[in-house]
Design a protein with these regions (language model features):
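N-terminal pre-Walker A segment at the start of P-loop NTPase domains
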Residues: 1-18
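P-loop (Walker A) phosphate-binding loop of NTP-binding proteins
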Residues: 35
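Short phosphate-coordinating micro-motif centered on Lys-Gly-acidic
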Residues: 1-3, 89-91, 97-143
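Conserved lysine of the Walker
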Residues: 40
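Short beta-strand-centered segment that lines the nucleotide-binding/catalytic pocket of NTP-utilizing
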Residues: 54-68
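Hydrophobic anchor at the beta1->P-loop junction of P-loop NTPases
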Residues: 30-32
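Phosphate-binding P-loop
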Residues: 21-27
């Protein structure tokens, strides 16, 4: 299924958050694709916040590759930023398969760096810019 959303600013994500919440009952992995500065990290932070993660606990995992957040009801979220990896095998060395089998929600920025390791049932969220600098179009694809 394909969903299309238009969002005025990355912090105006209520509709996206509701959709991700609904999809999270069926899907575990959410991949965010978009140019640098398109709002990937901001969207993920907003979604995690809606799941009860403390805003102060969240940061971009650019240097750590993965951050772990705790939300409501002891729910755990993994936030990956794959921009800095040079080879997908780097993920295997940090326990990638354990993350995938954890049954926790996984949000991935720059998934194209390791598509060979991302399960086929991952939700792909493509973020595009319109001519208006603030407007983002999102295409969310599920199996």
């Amino acid at each position: 299924m394909i969903y299309h959303l238009s969002i005025g600013k990355p912090d105006q994500v209520e509709e996206l958050t509701k959709l991700i919440h609904r999809l999270s009952s069926e899907f575990q992995i959410f991949c965010f694709q978009g140019e640098m500065g398109s709002g990937k990290t901001t969207y993920i932070k907003s979604i995690c916040s809606a799941f009860g993660v403390d805003d102060g606990e969240m940061s971009s995992p650019s240097f750590a590759i993965v951050n772990e957040y705790s939300g409501q009801n002891a729910r755990v979220f993994y936030h990956f930023d794959l921009d800095r990896i040079e080879d997908p095998s780097e993920l295997l060395r940090i326990g990638w398969e354990d993350y995938l089998t954890s049954n926790n929600l996984i949000f991935i920025e720059w998934p194209e760096k390791a598509m060979s390791l991302i399960p086929e049932d991952a939700v792909i969220i493509r973020i595009g810019h319109e001519s208006d600098v603030e407007l983002r179009t999102l295409e969310i694809t599920t199996l």
